[in-house]
A protein has these predicted regions:
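A solvent-exposed interaction/effector surface
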Residues: 1-161
């Protein structure tokens, strides 16, 4: 099954590293990066919302790399155009994201590499004279049924020039 994927433009590419510009988008966010946070969001897209509307899953799933972070799904473009339903669960925040630029490192494998990848990105940003804004973000593209060695991930830092 193919999922709608969040669109972006690649401004620069160097090996595994890309500078990406994301157009404005809408995300639904839960304050827990764990399985329980995923379940809260999944219930929203399964119809537990103000319109009882089922919403297609999208990729990637955004997660904060901190233990006390968040998990977020992006809203499909068609649902945004038609008007998305309000969340009934108070643990869900629906947020409009403005256009943003990120430096991203893509890889396949375990999320255990995240700290190493963040260091690689930070060195890249420092060498290019870019400024980081906010905390690192981990993007996940496959679910738990895919063996970890085959899972695609992006680690991103929001940047300003």
């Amino acid at each position: 099954m193919a999922y709608e994927q969040l669109k972006y433009d690649v401004l620069e590419k160097e090996g595994h590293i890309e500078i990406r510009k994301y157009a404005p988008f809408v995300m639904m966010k839960s304050g827990s990066p764990s399985y329980s946070g995923f379940q809260v969001l999944f219930s929203y897209i399964s119809g537990y919302n103000s319109k009882k509307q089922k919403i297609n899953m999208t990729v990637p799933v955004f997660t904060d790399v901190k233990e006390s972070g968040y998990i977020a799904f992006t809203m499909p473009e068609e649902v945004v155009k038609e008007g998305y339903p309000e969340a009934l669960d108070p643990r869900i925040n629906i947020e409009k994201q403005e256009e943003k630029t990120y430096v991203s490192y893509s890889y396949v494998g375990s999320i255990k590499k995240v700290d190493t990848v963040i260091k690689i990105l930070q060195d890249y940003v420092d060498n290019k004279g870019l400024k980081v804004q906010g905390d690192p973000v981990l993007l996940r593209y496959q679910g738990p049924m895919v063996p970890p060695i085959f899972r695609k991930h992006d680690v991103m830092l929001e940047i300003t020039f």
